[in-house]
Amino acid sequence: MRMQHFIFQFLALAWVAGAALAQELPVVDEGELRELCLRGECRFDVVTSVRLADGQVQEERITQHRPAILANSLSIMLGEELQAVADFDNNQFIRWRAAERREPSRNAVLDFKLTQTESDGSISLEVRNNGREPVKLNLFTRAPGAAGAEYTSSCPVIAGGSVYEYWSRPVVEVIVGEAVLVTDDGALQCN
């Protein structure tokens, strides 16, 4: 009986640790970022304006910001649209990359659009999946002036479909970490 209890505790701990790791903000290596910026791949003079709940507009200026597409993550600033491919090998996420002009239909090509609604000021992220498989994304949101981003729940994007994520608080950037192919119908739930 004691061994069963130990195995249960071990499995529970492994499950919690796995969930926590999936919710970690992807790290951008400083050396890699420096090289990318020297090659001109970074975004320069990024200005983002977000309307706050009190009606005022807060502007954020970033002199030099990471590229929109890195192998381990995507960055979508408020007002931006982005198209990226999630590469998989044996159903395991490998990397993000820019879409090619004529991408094979079997690839998970995703379109992102981050906007603020005029009526209530909420922020919405539209994600369109042009691939053949449902995909779940690990999303993180960054508030104006914040150095880091926080994990946020998200819904899977069905094959050939779209999903909208909404936030009532100000968000200037959404960072997309790992993508996961959804192979189980039960996993098509939002979390």
Pin down the residues of each PLM region.
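Short acidic, flexible loop segments centered on an aromatic residue
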Residues: 133-148
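N-terminal signal peptide c-region/cleavage motif recognized by signal peptidases
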Residues: 17-19
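N-terminal targeting leaders for non-cytosolic proteins
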Residues: 26-89
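Asparagine-centered strand-capping/turn motif at beta-strand->loop junctions
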Residues: 125-131
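Intrinsically disordered, low-complexity Pro/Gly/Ser/Thr-rich segments with frequent PxxP/GP/PP motifs
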Residues: 64-88, 144-181
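Bacterial N-terminal signal peptides that target proteins for export
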Residues: 1-10
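Low-complexity, acidic Ser/Thr/Pro/Gly-rich terminal tails and inter-domain linkers that flank the onset
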Residues: 31, 36-37, 42-45, 85, ...
